[in-house]
Amino acid sequence: MQEDEFITQHIAEKKQKRKKLMALAGKAALAGVSFALGAAAITCVTCPILAKKWRQSTEKNSVKIERDESRGEGESREQLSSPAEAESGSGEVNGEAENQNIREQVEQAIENRDYTLSDIRQMAGTLRKQADSADAAVVSVTHEQAERDWFNNALESSENYAGLAVAKTESELLFLTTTAAVEGTDTVTVTFARGDRMSATVKLRDSATHLAVLSLPITDANRDSLAKQAVIPFGNSYRLKRGDLLFLIGSPLGMIHSVKYGFLSNVRTNVSVMDGYATVYLPDVSGDAASGTWVLNADGELVGWMTDLFSETEAQSSTAILGISDLKPMIERMMNGKETAKLGIYGRQVGTTQREQGMPAGVYISRVEPNAPAYAAGMQPGDILISLGDSKIETMRDLEAALEKSAKGESVRLTLMRNGREKYETISVTATLAGR
């Protein structure tokens, strides 16, 4: 009898232990579910908050440049009149008769006035104040180069170029300079007008425009020093007209912090450049393009920079100014660390007259950049580009927009019309886009 009681008690104890274990397991599972539900609730609440904060942080540290409306006659000016015009660009802006009449009346009134020495001094003082204000945003960009002489002795050389402060976020101060200033280096020394020297890095280069963007991180150590740093606002180069006053700052004489004044003599629209077109301005003064010469309007806004891209053509000279309005999308991407995709062609929209004669609508290719993606894909001068990926191409604007949506390293399908013996034939090629 005692043995039966022992067996009963032993079994009962096992059942009680099993119940306790099951109860503990149930509590643990319930706690796990509660924790999971709590974590999910916290995630649902905090994720949107964190995402919002991340977006706000990104917005605070990104740069947005307001786009300028085109001149209005851009599409008609862009059309190809003949294959020879695809290189030079033929659009020339002439003032309307009414505006010209008003300008002549103003000029006549100015000529009839007798200016005193006091008037001249006052005008000179106004120009000087404007130049001094703009010069505060000019910096000297220097990078050291290590070399060796014939006896293998270490030599250090440096060259100075002009940079221009154009934007400031919570985390960095951004400058424009020339690609010559950052050749062979990713780090440069920036010297401010007040004498401070700081290290900056090359954010991006653009070989097509010879432009580079520098980034100087804003830290606790330099925040106070950079708090009042002047930056030059972007202007609208489309508004420039012949006879307008221009300020040349940076290094127009080949020396940093030099300045020149001049007047705009001529405007040429839709000049063919790689993968697009630009507006070129011809002033009555020269500047040093490689060293960095930045061009401001009378309001002290950046409207362009001196370029030597057209120095070998008859249509332009070494004093040409590249207008900023056509290039604002590219500059904005550079300042935000985004490289512009490169196809590597020069061309112009096929005009109405040519279409009536049987040429397909699209962009007539006048030249292909050697070793560019277009060259590697087999594109040739005389081809007419009609599509890039899913984008229909009829104008250079269409090509620019399609490349804006593309990225370096992306493979795109290009549809071309190539002139055969009797008619244009459709050809498809694939190009891997490079960076500019």
Each model region followed by its residue ranges:
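N-terminal targeting leaders that route proteins to membranes or the secretory/organellar pathways
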Residues: 1-150, 187, 222-223, 302
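Catalytic-histidine neighborhood of serine endopeptidases
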Residues: 48-56, 168-210, 216-219, 228
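PDZ/PDZ-like groove recognition
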Residues: 155, 335-402, 410, 415-436
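Active-site region of chymotrypsin-like
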Residues: 219-231, 259-320, 349-367
